Curated annotation (Swiss-Prot):
Glycosylation sites: 50, 58, 63, 68, 88, 146, 235, 386
Binding residues for Ca(2+): 294, 298, 324
Organism: Influenza A virus (strain A/Chicken/Hong Kong/715.5/2001 H5N1 genotype E)
Record key words, sorted: Calcium, Disulfide bond, Glycoprotein, Glycosidase, Host cell membrane, Host membrane, Hydrolase, Membrane, Metal-binding, Signal-anchor, Transmembrane, Transmembrane helix, Virion
Name this polypeptide is given: Neuraminidase
Gene label: NA
Length: 469
């Protein structure tokens, strides 16, 4: 073959290879286009892999999970019918408290992306329990955590994550803009209540299934505020308590009945010389009991109980085992406010069992440290300080904070009674520690009628952080 023939032969071979390669590329493009058309036609929208999406269709929750298999998204669906959380059962009989969750948020936040929070609380649907919390629009160990000791700011939001997990941007969902909040599930959807705005004109925004359904305007123009724990649902209606007025004197208190996110009824309590803040509410035999904070003049806790028509009764826990902080040493109680060390206070809870009461309280009488559960078999109505059970939760040498109640309905647990539970906030940072921030983690316990143990489950983070030095 002469040189010209060799050149022609090599050129022909290259041209054939090029044509074949071009045809393969065209075929590949057509294949990808057809595959994409089929996929989007079936799913209607592109979704990220390994993500769970919940949609609401005709009163049925549809759980959709996309699973990544060989770069192809396959959609699996499992429909879960909604229920009505009746709340008609009585509280389960219990002999003690079993540890349920601990998020270790501050320890994890020294190195990971964890929100600066306060006022965490837990609420359960018939499918899951979630931790709700008020963020400060900042992460731990970051410059924006500076000054987060402040209670009310436009940066605070209500968010939630699965119970027991540290609250981070990666596992949390936004619920509402709020510096005071509550949330609960009626068996069909989540109701959230978020209060934000100026002290002299704040507004509570009600959302149902994530959509704004109603609002409540401050009626006394003096820091409208709500529970900082779960609202309570009975037979499709949910109930919450709000306060508006002075934190150190007579204020105004209202109960709200809410159905599918809309206020259907409210009543203002006729409660002279009473002070209700940050109520912890739970259903029991079709009615609601709330145990609250007296920030004015009581070192024992006020309560209000009401039926679904908002017909109510009010009182104070009579026990000489006092539940607030600060408080005097245990002694003789009163069915009205106990005045010694009665000013200021802390959010807390109790569970009523007939004439008896489980009282949760800090171990210290004057600082937010330690926590214990006490069973006073006559404490709801009797004024002595005799009790029969004390269970340690946090040692007096470790910080605690707010505490509150939540319940697990029979639709979740499968038992024929309402399980009482509680959470404890473990506050760290300012004003007691040398940091630029204030935040907290949380633990929770549920009542059982079997073996339990007392111990100390503290926050456990070593401070200060890098940002504080």
């Amino acid at each position: 073959m002469n040189p010209n023939q060799k050149i022609i032969t090599i050129g022909s071979i290259c041209m054939v290879i090029g044509i074949v390669s071009l045809m393969l590329q065209i075929g590949n493009i057509i294949s990808i286009w057809v595959s994409h058309s089929i996929q989007t036609g079936n799913q209607h929208q592109a979704e990220p892999c390994n993500q769970s999406i919940i949609t609401y269709e005709n009163n049925t929750w549809v759980n959709q999970t996309y699973v990544n298999i060989s770069n192809t998204n396959f959609l699996t669906e499992k429909a879960v019918a909604s229920v009505t959380l009746a709340g008609n059962s009585s509280l389960c009989p219990i002999s003690g408290w079993a540890v349920y969750s601990k998020d270790n948020g501050i320890r994890i936040g020294s190195k990971g992306d964890v929100f600066v929070i306060r006022e965490p609380f837990i609420s359960c649907s018939h499918l899951e329990c979630r931790t709700f919390f008020l963020t400060q629009g900042a992460l731990l160990n970051d410059k924006h955590s500076n000054g987060t000791v402040k209670d009310r700011s436009p940066y605070r939001t209500l968010m939630s994550c699965p119970v027991g997990e540290a609250p981070s941007p990666y596992n949390s969902r936004f619920e509402s803009v709020a510096w005071s909040a509550s949330a609960c599930h009626d068996g069909t959807s989540w109701l959230t209540i978020g209060i934000s705005g100026p002290d002299n004109g704040a507004v509570a925004v009600l959302k149902y299934n994530g959509i704004i359904t109603d609002t409540i305007k401050s009626w006394r123009n003096n820091i409208l505020r709500t529970q900082e724990s779960e609202c309570a649902c009975v037979n499709g209606s949910c109930f919450t308590v709000m306060t508006d007025g002075p934190s150190n004197g007579q204020a105004s208190y209202k109960i709200f009945k809410i159905e599918k996110g809309k206020v259907v009824k409210s009543v203002e309590l006729n409660a002279p010389n009473y002070h209700y803040e940050e109520c912890s509410c739970y259903p029991d035999a079709g009615e609601i009991t709330c145990v609250c904070r007296d920030n004015w003049h009581g070192s024992n806790r006020p309560w209000v109980s009401f039926n679904q028509n908002l017909e109510y009764q009010i009182g104070y826990i009579c026990s000489g085992v006092f539940g607030d902080n600060p408080r005097p040493n245990d002694g003789t109680g009163s069915c009205g406010p106990v005045s010694p060390n009665g000013a200021y206070g802390i959010k807390g809870f109790s569970f009523k069992y007939g004439n008896g009461v489980w009282i949760g309280r800090t171990k210290s009488t004057n600082s937010r440290s330690g926590f214990e559960m006490i069973w006073d078999p006559n404490g709801w109505t009797g004024t002595d300080s005799n009790f029969s059970v004390k269970q340690d939760i946090v040692a007096i040498t470790d910080w605690s904070g707010y505490s509150g109640s939540f319940v697990q309905h029979p639709e979740l647990t499968g038992v024929d009674c309402i399980r009482p539970c509680f959470w404890v906030e473990l506050i760290r940072g300012r004003p007691k520690e040398s940091t630029i921030w204030t935040s907290g983690s949380s633990i929770s316990f549920c009542g059982v009628n079997s073996d339990t143990v007392g111990w100390s489950w503290p926050d456990g983070a070593e401070l200060p952080f890098t940002i504080d030095k």
